[in-house]
């Protein structure tokens, strides 16, 4: 676009400023998602994006907020471009704000390539089925809710639960075993407090994990509009590293609830008709557009795996945010307040947790041939032990049979030995499966009906087996 075009698309016709939005009248040729440059009456430069166009009226969201803007002397220039981010492998080890500007004191990135942050949809016929195991070092995920390369597996948490610690541990420990390809982590934080931001930064820097991590950080006191851009910046960076540089990328996004609250705030400012619990009706489409940027493409070496984290309001798994997320993603890892109260970390409740693509990433040649059977048997035994624990609270332990007492003991040991691990404990998949077998040895061998007999003979610690 030449200078004349730029000049003719500069307007001082702002008619309204409301919340994060401003309305510009008399606009020619404005387009949805177009980037605008804003000059405040004090001469400060800001950036915005067109949200809506109707005839000659454009509604613009301002990334840095609308404070100090007025309807008399605010200048708005329409650039004819969509939001883009300059990308380079030098972004690994760097920290950016929610709109991609460095905030770690380092130099600006010299980009190898610029990409639209809205991404381009993957052709469904070009998608490759997610496969290959990603080891997180956490037994409840690796052993029973396996994360597979190219999958989207959210973590459902509650206020006050240690999801931040779990996210940092996964970012630090995650790896693709038996692969020579490079592995990277993109960490996108939305609406987090300064205390949480300091925790993540200290965690990444002190453990040396930052060198393979790119961080996009939007704080709670940053504009809500920036919160909408943060996951787009993170996912565009992931697409560049995965599909242009052939890396395996794990994207951790926290907190999706804050992202959806920002959607609701902007929707309210636009006077849109609200949907369930005040959230916009297009929230499902918006979340799907974000989650579906995970995956693998035929002929491409790299992959994008997503682990979004969301805090369920009032621990309500039927709330629209976890509800819609569950429709789109391929399972969920659920954190339990009850386990957290007993001091167990990570407090993963395996019974409502699920990885729908687990079968594609486990077994001989990927993890171990007994993995599926061990997982099924652990689920069955723990579920029965939990039921017996509830029964014991009613009838007392004296009413239980010897068999029942063994399942009850198994449930206690499972929580204390398998679920519980320290925040810096990185268990291999072999250690996780061996631990599972050790716990199953508490039960009579005749109860191990979900594992093939040959694996029982091969892996069950014989000295501890009770017939």
Curated annotation (Swiss-Prot):
One of its GO terms (biological process) is proton motive force-driven plasma membrane ATP synthesis. InterPro entries: ATP-synt_VA_C (IPR055190), ATPase_a/bsu_AS (IPR020003), ATPase_A1-cplx_bsu (IPR005724), ATPase_F1/V1/A1_a/bsu_N (IPR004100), ATPase_F1/V1/A1_a/bsu_N_sf (IPR036121), ATPase_F1/V1/A1_a/bsu_nucl-bd (IPR000194), P-loop_NTPase (IPR027417), V-ATPase_su_B/beta (IPR022879). Has multiple subunits with at least A(3), B(3), C, D, E, F, H, I and proteolipid K(x). One of its GO terms (molecular function) is proton-transporting ATP synthase activity, rotational mechanism. It is a peripheral membrane protein. The keyword Nucleotide-binding does not apply. Component of the A-type ATP synthase that produces ATP from ADP in the presence of a proton gradient across the membrane. The B chain is a regulatory subunit. One of its GO terms (cellular component) is plasma membrane. This is A-type ATP synthase subunit B.
